[in-house]
Amino acid sequence: MTHFTEPKVIYQEANPYGTFTAYLEDDGRTVYLYLQGEQNPEFGIKSVWVCNRVEAPDKRSAEDLSNGLAPLLLHSEVNEPKPQPAFEEKELYFIWTEEGDGVALFYKEVLVAFLPSWSGIKGFHGYSFHAKIEALTAYPLGNSDFGIIPDRVRASRNFWEARSKQGAWKEIQEKRLSFLESKFGKHDKYWSADGGKYPQLGIARFQSEKFPEILIYSTIGMSAQNMPTVELFHKDYEDYARIELILAVKIGLEGLERSESWVPHLIGELIRFPWNMAKWFGHGHTITMSRKDPEALYLNFTSVLFRDFESFSLLNVPDLSGFISENGKQVRFLTLLPVSEEEKEYAQKGGIQSFNRMWDEKGFSWYHNSERQTLI
């Protein structure tokens, strides 16, 4: 009969965003690294085998599986079949990925495991220094100092060190405000939008002489860190991972302040979404509107469509290209276009290119008009 002890969490830590928690668990047989989402129940729990704490067996035990025990790696799957000693908590620490949905485990300053954002896809778990071959719950990490994984972890360490420097947020904030003010003129309102949590974020409002009929609201700071999971969809993910959102609204009959009742709140609910949910925003994406437009006249706007400013064929669209983030990559500015349920379904079925072409042909603009007619 297999003897086992109650699993013990020997190290635990939340990511800097406060949205994911990683913990290291030792059940006397194995040590596993786990990652769970705090705000997205769909994320579930991801895991990677770190090491065996008992002699590596030649085959897996059906009894272990029936008892719900974490799988051991076999003699043929590990670098060292002998039991690994217990970890000393004081020698453990995590380095989180910039995106916050992946974590590296260090022990005595050595990288021993990495649980990346693509963990959980097609049966993949993560990487372990003690894995010899591609096994059930771990792939080999290889060299802990050189290679793609160590380089990536090193880049994450450098990112967090840079962000922890005094004055880092002020530089980030001023750089973005300066760029937007070169396009729209001085901002006339600013809200802190991070709720006192990391990352620091804000919303700025502009009344531009170039666009006197509209109010322009922009996020400040989203582009200072990569969004999660972009690399699952784009090989050159760093070209898509940094964005700022803009929601511009045509000034209605009720004046400037009417938009204040919903626009900053809507943006405020979107601004942390990527890091809260481990999801990303990109050109052609849609998301349900959490706030209603009180000035909507003909349409019930239920979703917002994200559209890259560079995709418009219209005249009089601001040129927001050329802004480079701290990582040397260009920032993509996405405008938020409220759409009806019918318009959203049309875009999803017919394709975003067809939808955008029709939008431009009908002369709809890059900003939101509460009184517009339906596109379809």
What are these regions (language model features)?
Residues 1-376:
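Short linear motifs embedded in intrinsically disordered, proline/glycine-rich low-complexity segments
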